[in-house]
Regions:
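Anionic-ligand binding patches
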Residues: 1-170
Length: 170
């Protein structure tokens, strides 16, 4: 069930410096708005050669109205000319679980890889067409070429969800 399903149209201000801070902000916001337990996600892409950028600005890296293609193009321009070993990146997901009267629980999942030199594939969203998981050779398949099932086994969100499961069952 989402906040939209409950008729809540306000969004929290995601001004935290980290994925964890923003996930906590969203979970606390949902808990306070509904009084119900809330599970929130904050995710993004970190590129080593860019000191972790785009990071918490992943969705709006090329500007507030930027499309996925705009964000991908900006990132590819910034990494132009770098060899595969300097294009290391990771997707990060932090899940935050907020329950009434309890501390917020967070779990982090990552998926390591590298940024391709050009987009390949149209599946997924965001940076998927330019993200090569670590198990792929340079020039191999990007997440844009993975099936939902394949991506679901190794994605940062899947890993965070597996780590959160015990807290959800408690």
């Amino acid at each position: 069930m989402s906040l939209d399903d409950l008729g809540l149209t306000d969004d929290p201000v995601e001004d935290g410096p980290t994925f964890e801070a923003n996930a906590r902000i969203k979970a606390r916001f949902a808990l306070e708005a509904t009084g119900l337990p809330a599970l929130a996600d904050d995710s993004g892409l970190e590129v080593e050669a860019l000191d972790g950028r785009p990071g918490v600005h992943t969705r709006r890296y090329a500007g507030p109205e930027a499309t996925d293609a705009d964000n991908n193009a900006k990132l590819l321009r910034e990494l132009a000319g770098l060899p595969p070993e300097r294009r290391s990146a990771r997707y990060v997901c932090v899940l935050a679980l907020a329950r009434p009267g309890a501390p917020i629980v967070t779990r982090r999942g990552t998926c390591r890889g590298r940024i391709a030199t050009e987009p390949r594939g149209s599946g997924g969203f965001g940076y998927d067409p330019i993200f090569e998981p670590a198990d792929e050779p340079p020039g191999g398949r990007t997440f844009g070429l993975y099936s939902d099932e394949e991506k679901g086994r190794i994605s940062h969100r899947a890993r965070a969800a597996r780590r959160m499961r015990p807290a959800l069952e408690a």
